[in-house]
A protein has these predicted regions:
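Histidine/acidic residue-rich metal-binding segments in metalloenzymes
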Residues: 83-94, 119-197
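Flexible loop/turn segments at secondary-structure boundaries
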Residues: 16, 43-47, 106-109, 152-157, ...
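Short, small-residue-rich loop/turn micro-motifs
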Residues: 1, 102, 106, 149-151
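A generic secondary-structure micro-motif detector
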Residues: 13-15, 75, 123, 164
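Divalent-metal coordination cores built from histidine and acidic residues
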Residues: 21-144
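A short alpha-helix capping/helix-coil boundary motif
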Residues: 2-6, 111-114, 151-155
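A short, structure-level motif marking secondary-structure boundaries and short turns
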Residues: 8-10, 71, 117-119, 159-160
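Di-metal (Zn2+ and/or Mg2+/Mn2+) metal-binding site signature of metallo-dependent hydrolases
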Residues: 3-27
């Protein structure tokens, strides 16, 4: 028999790149999904500096097994900030509704540069800047903030994610940004309380 159902909402997708070059969010749109949320697992493509394009592609390829060659060919990088990315998406039309979250890895590398990629501890100034950019992302329409502290998430080169060793004060700083925004979700994948523990 057949079923009549409302549209399904897929709260965990990685269409962050595909949404910049395709109006079809397939295969989800082929299966009755009418809304998707992307920016999960702390990986995504904004905010980004031109020098960090390859790193963000390596993260998405490694964490989500999305071919780097497709991302390299498809991403136009016509944005830098997360609000710019949201504006870019807003100019496009899709076969379903999409929502984006601000990814911690991109945010951390944007603010801290190589120190962030190398998993060095964030300073109070770094945290304040990440917090402010998260507030701005929420004002631009982000649904929330995502992070990952799991050893299973690695770049395509096998390196741990920039967020693996993010400390509690850094994560609390991002949570306080959501409080300031007055809304949003915080999604985090974590295998441990402390890396050494």
């Amino acid at each position: 028999g057949c079923y009549v159902t409302p549209g399904f909402v897929d709260i965990h997708t990685h269409y962050d790149g595909q949404a910049t070059w395709s109006n079809r969010m397939s295969p989800s749109s082929h299966h009755g999904v009418t809304s998707v949320v992307m920016g999960n697992c702390g990986v995504g493509f904004a905010p980004v500096r031109p020098t960090d394009h390859d790193l963000l592609i390596e993260l998405m390829e490694g964490v989500e097994d999305i071919p780097g060659v497709a991302l390299n060919e498809g991403l136009s990088w016509d944005w830098e900030s997360f609000p710019d990315y949201m504006d870019y998406l807003a100019k496009r039309q899709f076969d379903m509704d999409i929502g984006a979250q601000i990814p911690h890895a991109a945010l951390r590398v944007y603010v801290m540069g190589q120190r962030g990629a190398d998993r060095e501890p964030a300073t109070a100034e770094d945290i304040a800047q990440m917090r402010q950019l998260t507030v701005e992302a929420m004002a631009a329409g982000a649904l929330g903030f995502t992070s990952s502290r799991t050893l299973n998430h690695r770049t395509s080169r096998g390196e741990p994610t920039p967020t693996l060793q993010a400390e509690v004060d850094e994560l609390l700083g991002m949570a306080s940004a959501l409080k300031t925004a007055g809304r949003g979700v915080m999604e985090m994948i974590s295998d441990f309380e402390d890396l050494d523990g």
